[in-house]
Amino acid sequence: MFLIRTINIDPRGCHDIDDVVSLWEEGGVWTLAISIADVAAFAALNPALLFAEKIGQTLYTSGGKALRPMFPLKFSEDIFSLLPGEERFAVSLFAKWDGTILYDIQWKECIVRNWASYTYENCKDCSEINMDVLYKIVTSLGEETGDTHKWVEYLMLFYNSEAAAVLKRAGAGLLRIHGEPEKELLARLESLSLPANELAYPAAVYATTDTVGGHWGLRKDAYCHASSPIRRYADVLNQEVLKAVLRGGQGTHVSYKHYALALNRLDKSAKAYERDCRFVDCILGAPGAPVHGIVVELLNGKTSIYCYDWKRMIRCKTGATLTMGDQVLIGFYVNMTTASWKNRIVYHVERV
């Protein structure tokens, strides 16, 4: 794929480039290729890299900087990364485009060269590939939008969905399972005009391929993580399966149930870290300034309140008599004498 024009679209300043996109016309037929950095090839040759399974995924600061990379920076931002002008191993999905749908899906192990790097802000000026055709393709995968973040998202969802189908047939790897939301809570949040999609949905989890269920939020019968192996260890495991299938095998003989349990624990911790970072940013951004909220639930002596400014739920004891739907004003201060930082934030709630 040296002569095929290929680009990446990522946030400004991104160095750990997982994915690149190619698009070309030959004989009147358009072909799309989505190529993902072949991290599994290096992990297989260097057992020391398997330490990444203890980390699970890269953690980022609120500004997008890698705070704790899953792999050493020399690997994640250099050896693995699909940097412009460099030749790299990749696991690629190829699909033909007939103007309406993508068809003739094929998987290949490739060597790719990234021709140019673009950001979400300037990628529409790309001259290496036909962006008008790419726009039509991503619209067929999702919905019509000028948001280039969504363009990349739709392409990765397509890659991951097709990868999940391969894993299911092979009976190996890790799927991403997402159950239906709690209907009672969903109805309550909708009645209060709150973001039900964010607050009522259960967290998606990793599971083995024999697990019943799909991804409710994405409306997929089967879905997996395979497009970010530099940043997530589940993607490395699934990439190993894809490569084994391409070579005529059925995947590696490992305990995927063990990996599912371990990665779910790490995933939960990572989400808590991201959530807490956003929360602390809010607290530090306006220390002591009261914020507005609405009462969502009263249970076991505690009140669940959605804070509009913080875009999150808090649970706390309140002295006031409140009912669901009450608008409240939340004051807070920090008590540094307690061990847990969450308990250091003391709330005072008043009905508006």
Q: Where are the predicted features?
A:
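Electropositive polyanion-binding surfaces
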Residues: 1-352
